[in-house]
A protein has these predicted regions:
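Short alpha-helical segments enriched in small residues
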Residues: 2-126
Length: 126
């Protein structure tokens, strides 16, 4: 997202929170949410986006949590499962789920970035 010159005009910060500890400490994801739903869940994505918005001076925040692969999947949460959430002003919060399948780690990551940018664009127009 920051490869384009001038991106600092619209990107205030980015957080990478792979561990549950980072999700709790940096984004305020509740330990109860992680215990009940796991890191890869709609509930966690929603709390991540809301926490990112609170932790910044931004108008919008997007969160992604998923299983890019090649390992780490399960029957319930297979490789390619990704949850997204976009938070905006006035408690506006939209979440979606995508199941990309086993298309390769790089392809899952790229598709996830595209989806996140589409969510941000839609939220900016709303």
């Amino acid at each position: 997202m920051t490869e384009i010159a001038g991106s600092s005009d619209v990107v205030e910060r980015g957080l990478v929170t792979y561990s549950n500890e980072a999700k709790r400490e940096l984004l305020g994801v509740a330990a109860e949410t992680l215990a009940a739903h796991g890191a890869v869940s709609e509930a966690t994505a929603r709390e991540m986006a809301a926490g990112a918005l609170r932790a910044s001076r931004a108008d919008l925040a997007v969160a992604i949590t998923g299983v890019a692969g090649p390992g780490g999947g399960s029957a319930e949460k297979p490789v390619g499962l990704v949850h997204f959430a976009c938070a905006g002003p006035g408690d506006r919060l939209v979440a979606i789920e995508r199941r990309y399948g086993e298309i390769g780690r790089g392809a899952v990551r790229l598709a996830s970035v595209v989806q996140a940018l589409e969510m941000l664009a839609a939220a900016a127009k709303a």
